[in-house]
């Protein structure tokens, strides 16, 4: 691989984008990002991994951020490639309290609230080319220390064993 690409992947991304267009001009190129970067303007389509309402922010900030990006780059075909919140079906709460993402308490009702509120923001913006939930199933994630099972990402809409659909699934 090109030396220095980790420090600045943009030249390699531009090279790959040109190569893809050379092979098939009819297919759009796609990228995913979680930050402001010139890389976001290289592919035909860009999607962002954003977790407003889970990692410290408020769910309503999703729409504000999307609108700001859309105003700044109106020609950019943008979408949301990841949004989600953790949940354990064996943790329930009577009140709605934002859990600590890196903690062990991930009540199911927060995940449901999170998806309802974020979907309101996403559904009201038809210019987004994609709106992907992260993710369908809880999955193994080495080194992760959050939720009730270390080594697991609990953002799925269905439990790890595929047996229980969490409330947010519906």
Tell where the protein language model's regions lie, with residue ranges.
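Substrate-binding clefts and catalytic carboxylate motifs of secreted carbohydrate-active enzymes
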Residues: 9-30, 38-45, 50-170
